[in-house]
């Protein structure tokens, strides 16, 4: 299955994202702690924790830092009051946006999320307003690789789909609970992924033009700058031509 490269949609934001690495680590640690607290410290029997571990390793977090976070969660700590909250809304150009948060103060979090939507011409919706457009999946990514080899190994390991992109990148889609097992099987076959994460995959895309694309990117940046926001999912599609103008 061929598709438009997601790397083209994100490469122009790489520098800004690299600058946020410290904040990304903080958010990953918070997810590791929460996942371990809720489901135990063994990634093999805790899919949420395994997904967090895979994300931590994909972002080059050390095993020592990772293990300390898990130990904090198992032992109970100051993050015990954290809860997962999902906000839904519409961004620039009618994009569907889902915002996953970990928060100990709902009032603070919703105020920050609503502010980001309002400042960029979007609006915060009600529960269920856009979530029906997304499916929770595991995504195992290869920047380059042999399509036939990866596809054969992935499907043999239980993957649901394999998507190839114009620039040679390949994504393997799995049931989110099975992502860790599929990644292990791929590595056992000599195929080391560049990234693995649980994501919300949209069923439809909204094409962004030169006017709406910068507004969408600003919304994403504002949301990601919120300490309580863990992940931002959207169905905006930015073409190579539009990305080149940003």
Swiss-Prot record:
GO molecular function list: DNA binding
Location in or out of the cell: Cytoplasm
Keyword line: Cytoplasm, DNA-binding, Transcription, Transcription regulation
Gene Ontology biological-process entries: regulation of DNA-templated transcription
InterPro entries named in the record: Integrase-like_N, TACO1_YebC-like_2nd/3rd_dom, TACO1_YebC_N, Transcrip_reg_TACO1-like, Transcrip_reg_TACO1-like_dom3, YebC-like
Predominant location: cytoplasm
Gene Ontology cellular-component terms listed: cytosol
Gene3D superfamilies found in the cross-reference section: 1.10.10.200, 3.30.70.980
Record bears the keyword Phosphoprotein: no
Listed Pfam families: TACO1_YebC_N, Transcrip_reg
Family: Belongs to the TACO1 family.
Annotated protein name in UniProt: Probable transcriptional regulatory protein KPN78578_23430
Organism: Klebsiella pneumoniae subsp. pneumoniae (strain ATCC 700721 / MGH 78578)
